[in-house]
A protein has these predicted regions:
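Intrinsically disordered, low-complexity Pro/Gly/Ser/Thr-rich segments with frequent PxxP/GP/PP motifs
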Residues: 164-179
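Substrate-binding clefts and catalytic carboxylate motifs of secreted carbohydrate-active enzymes
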Residues: 2-164
Length: 179
C-alpha cells in the first residue's frame, strides 16, 4: 500500500485487522524457495510459480525507488526497506488521528502458519523481518513523525508520562543520502 494512504484514508475508529506487506529477508526465502526459483519478481509480470504458490503480492512500485532489484537477494534487502516503511507509516497514520478519530488498532496476522510471502512480521521459522521493527518504531512511547500530506512534524506521546518542553531538530535527506 502507498504509505500516504495510512494518513489520507480513515478506516474504522477501532480497527482490529490492519496490516500490509511482509516478504521475509533473504535468509528466510532461502529456507523454502528452491535455488532455481530465487528470481526477483518483476513489476507487472507474473511472478515465478513458486513465489505465486506462496502468495506473493507484487509491490515493486514501492521497491523500485530504491533501484530495480538485480536478483532475489537484492530484492529481499530492498523489500525490507519497504516493509519497515509500510508498518512505521501504518502506525503513524493511526497515531496522527488517535482520539480524534481512532481509538485503537490491532495488527492482523503477525505471522503465517506456513511459508508465505505476505502479511507477516516474522516468518514460519520465527525469523523477524523489517515490518516488526517499523511497527515498533512507529509505536514507540515518544515518537517524532512527519505527515506526508501537509509536511507537519508532530511529536506523539504514546507513553503514560506527560512530556513537556521538548524540541525537535530535524534534517532532510534525499534518496541518495544527501542533505
Amino acid at each position: 500500500q502507498d504509505p500516504i494512504s495510512f494518513w489520507a484514508v480513515k478506516t474504522f475508529p477501532y480497527n482490529s485487522e490492519v496490516g500490509s506487506v511482509g516478504v521475509g529477508d533473504y535468509e528466510s526465502l532461502e529456507r523454502f524457495i528452491p535455488k532455481e526459483n530465487m528470481i526477483a519478481p518483476q513489476f507487472k509480470n507474473k511472478p515465478d510459480s513458486v513465489w505465486d504458490y506462496h502468495k506473493y503480492i507484487g509491490y515493486d512500485q514501492y521497491i523500485n525507488p530504491y533501484g530495480k532489484a538485480k536478483d532475489a537477494k537484492d530484492f529481499a534487502m530492498k523489500a525490507q526497506l519497504v516493509n519497515y516503511d509500510q508498518y512505521r507509516a501504518l502506525m503513524e497514520g493511526f497515531s496522527n488521528k488517535m482520539w480524534d478519530w481512532y481509538t485503537g488498532s490491532i495488527i492482523w496476522k503477525t505471522q503465517n502458519p506456513w511459508t508465505a510471502l505476505r502479511g507477516q512480521m516474522y516468518d514460519y521459522y520465527l525469523d523477524p523481518n523489517a515490518c516488526l521493527y517499523g511497527l515498533r518504531k512507529g509505536s514507540e512511547p515518544l515518537h517524532i513523525m512527519m505527515n506526508p500530506l501537509d509536511s507537519m512534524v508532530t511529536v506523539v506521546n504514546n507513553g503514560l508520562t506527560d512530556r513537556n518542553n521538548l524540541m525537535v531538530q530535524a534534517k532532510v535527506y534525499d534518496m541518495a543520502g544527501k542533505d
